[in-house]
Structures are given as C-alpha cells and as structure tokens.
C-alpha cells in the first residue's frame, strides 16, 4: 500500500538507492499503489558515479510491498520491505540486474523483462 510521500528501496543496479513517491499512476483519484503499479518518484539517495542524480524524477514499478497482497486462490503474499524497479519510457528496466524476490503479479501486468532478471519469483 504505497501512497504519496512513501519511501521505496530500489531493487536494481540502476544507481539509485532510495525513492520518494510523488504520484501513483492510473487514474485521477488513485490513492494507493500495490505490486505491479507504476509510480512517479524522486530519487533521494544514489550510488556515486552513476547515471542517476539525486532529485531526478523517474518512473518505477512496485515489485515488493509490506502490505499483504491477496491472490485469487485466497493466499496472501507479503515482503520485508517496499521496493521498486526503475523503468524507462518504454516500460523496460533501466538496470541490468534485479535484487531480491519479486511477486508473481509483475508477470500478470506484463513486465516480462523484470521477471527474467529477477533471481526469484514468488
């Protein structure tokens, strides 16, 4: 359950480490984002000497949330942190690696490149 001003960890090697959500995409009054949603973020913490600058506005896909996500079979999945993967204007990941597990809902939303880079899909 990600909303405006939420902080996210970055789960890829794009160069950013922390993001702050500016807006959850997908509708005029959409308040909360969950796994698979696109968010517009400001970069708050970066790795030195990378292509990403602090304060840069980027788009990202949420891949993990602490809030449990209910699946159609009645099971729930939750993670230890809130994390996202940075994407470009073609919805492809900006990094070349993804760290940590990602939820299966990412595949259903059509982010196959992120699924192929992830070490584990839960």
Curated annotation (Swiss-Prot):
PROSITE patterns: RIBOSOMAL_L14 (PS00049). Keywords: Ribonucleoprotein, Ribosomal protein, RNA-binding, rRNA-binding. Pfam families: Ribosomal_L14. GO terms for cellular component: cytosolic large ribosomal subunit. SUPFAM superfamilies: Ribosomal protein L14 (SSF50193). One of its GO terms (biological process) is translation. It comes from the Bacteria. SMART domains: Ribosomal_L14. GO terms for molecular function: large ribosomal subunit rRNA binding; structural constituent of ribosome. Belongs to the universal ribosomal protein uL14 family. Part of the 50S ribosomal subunit. Forms a cluster with proteins L3 and L19. In the 70S ribosome, L14 and L19 interact and together make contacts with the 16S rRNA in bridges B5 and B8. Binds to 23S rRNA. Forms part of two intersubunit bridges in the 70S ribosome. This is Large ribosomal subunit protein uL14. It comes from Pseudothermotoga lettingae (strain ATCC BAA-301 / DSM 14385 / NBRC 107922 / TMO) (Thermotoga lettingae). The lineage of its organism: Bacteria, Thermotogati, Thermotogota, Thermotogae, Thermotogales.
